[in-house]
C-alpha cells in the first residue's frame, strides 16, 4: 500500500522567520504519517531553520534542488551530501522551472538522482509537457522519454523508493488544472513506463504525485484516482491553513 505524499514547493518564497512561523502553525495539526506524508520543500537559505522547527513533528523536509557533485568549485550549488548531513529527507529535481530557466537536461537530472541516492536523500523527480506538446497529442511520448532518461541506471530498489511528480507545464501557476481524468491518465502512463523498465512490484511501489495548481478545492478529486499518490503543491502550500487543508484531505 502506497502512503500518500503531499509536498509543498515554496519556490523562491519565505524567509527564515516566516518559515518558523509556518512550521509552528502546522506542526501539531498534521495527519498521521502512516496515512499521509506531509512535506515542505523550501529554499536552501531556509532549510536549517525548517529542519530545526520541524524536529519532533510529523513534517518531513525537502530541498528544491541539488547538484550532482558533493563538493568542489561549483559556486552557488547545493551539495546532496550536506543535505543528508542536515537531515533533509527529500529533494525536488527536474522541475520545469529548473529545466526552462536554468537549462537543465535529462542527463543532469539523472546524475542528480544518482547523487541524491548515493547520499541518502530521496529524489522527487519532476516531469511534464508543454501546452504545445499536449495540443500536438504527444504528451505521453514526451513524458515517457523524460522518465526513461531520469531513471537510467537506477536500480529497481531505488526506483521503488523515489517519488515522481507529473507537472504539466501549462498548469503550473496558471490557475489551469489538468482535469482529474487527464492527471490520472498521465500518472497511469508513468506507472506503466516504470513497469516496462523494471517490473510490476516496482511500479506498484513508486509514488506518483500530480502537480499544477493543486489546491484544497480539487485535492480530494485528484487523490481519489488510483494512480495519483499525492500532490506537489506550489502557491497553496505557502499558507498554513491551506497546507493543512491539503494534507488533511482524508478528513
Curated annotation (Swiss-Prot):
Q: Has the keyword Isomerase been applied to this entry?
A: yes
Which positions bind substrate?
A: 9-11, 173, 213, 234-235
Q: InterPro entries from the xrefs?
A: Aldolase_TIM, TIM_sf, TrioseP_Isoase_bac/euk, Triosephosphate_isomerase, Triosephosphate_isomerase_AS
Principal EC category: isomerase
Where does the record say this protein resides? Cytoplasm
GO cellular component, alphabetical, reads:
cytosol
Q: In which pathway does it act?
A: Carbohydrate biosynthesis; gluconeogenesis; Carbohydrate degradation; glycolysis; D-glyceraldehyde 3-phosphate from glycerone phosphate: step 1/1
Gene Ontology molecular-function annotations: triose-phosphate isomerase activity
Q: Which UniProt keywords apply?
A: Cytoplasm, Gluconeogenesis, Glycolysis, Isomerase
Cite the Pfam families for this sequence: TIM
Q: What is its EC number?
A: 5.3.1.1
Active site (record annotation)? 95, 167
Catalysed reactions, semicolon-separated: D-glyceraldehyde 3-phosphate = dihydroxyacetone phosphate
One GO BP: glycolytic process
What is known about what this protein does? Involved in the gluconeogenesis. Catalyzes stereospecifically the conversion of dihydroxyacetone phosphate (DHAP) to D-glyceraldehyde-3-phosphate (G3P).
> Quaternary structure per UniProt?
Homodimer.
Task: State the HAMAP family in the record.
Answer: TIM_B (MF_00147_B)
- By its UniProt entry, which PANTHER family does this protein fall under? TRIOSEPHOSPHATE ISOMERASE
Task: Report the sequence similarity comment from the record.
Answer: Belongs to the triosephosphate isomerase family.
Protein name from the UniProt record? Triosephosphate isomerase
Q: Supply the source organism for this entry.
A: Lactobacillus gasseri (strain ATCC 33323 / DSM 20243 / BCRC 14619 / CIP 102991 / JCM 1131 / KCTC 3163 / NCIMB 11718 / NCTC 13722 / AM63)
What does the record give as the organism's lineage?
Bacteria, Bacillati, Bacillota, Bacilli, Lactobacillales
Which gene does this sequence derive from? tpiA
Amino acid at each position: 500500500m502506497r502512503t500518500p505524499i503531499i509536498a509543498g514547493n515554496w519556490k523562491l518564497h519565505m524567509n527564515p522567520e516566516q518559515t518558523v512561523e509556518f512550521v509552528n502553525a502546522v506542526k501539531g495539526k498534521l495527519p498521521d504519517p502512516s496515512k499521509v506524508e506531509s512535506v515542505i520543500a523550501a529554499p536552501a537559505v531556509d532549510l536549517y531553520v525548517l529542519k530545526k522547527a520541524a524536529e519532533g513533528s510529523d513534517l518531513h523536509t525537502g530541498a528544491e534542488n541539488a547538484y550532482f557533485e558533493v563538493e568542489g568549485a561549483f559556486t552557488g550549488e547545493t551539495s546532496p551530501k550536506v543535505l543528508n548531513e542536515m537531515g533533509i529527507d527529500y529533494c525536488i529535481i527536474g522541475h520545469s522551472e529548473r529545466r526552462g530557466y536554468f537549462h537543465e537536461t535529462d542527463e543532469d537530472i539523472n546524475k542528480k538522482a544518482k547523487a541524491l541516492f548515493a547520499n541518502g536523500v530521496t529524489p522527487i523527480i519532476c516531469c511534464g509537457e508543454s501546452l504545445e506538446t499536449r495540443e500536438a497529442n504527444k504528451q505521453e511520448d514526451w513524458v515517457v522519454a523524460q522518465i526513461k532518461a531520469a531513471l537510467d541506471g537506477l536500480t529497481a530498489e531505488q526506483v521503488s523508493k523515489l517519488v515522481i511528480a507529473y507537472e504539466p507545464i501549462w498548469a503550473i501557476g496558471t490557475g489551469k488544472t489538468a482535469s482529474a481524468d487527464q492527471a490520472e491518465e498521465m500518472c497511469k502512463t508513468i506507472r506503466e513506463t516504470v513497469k516496462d523498465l523494471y517490473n510490476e512490484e516496482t511500479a506498484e511501489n513508486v509514488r506518483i504525485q500530480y502537480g499544477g495548481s493543486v489546491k484544497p478545492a480539487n485535492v480530494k478529486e485528484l487523490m481519489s484516482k488510483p494512480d495519483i499518490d499525492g500532490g506537489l503543491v506550489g502557491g497553496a502550500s505557502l499558507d498554513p491553513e491551506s497546507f493543512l487543508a491539503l494534507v488533511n484531505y482524508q478528513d
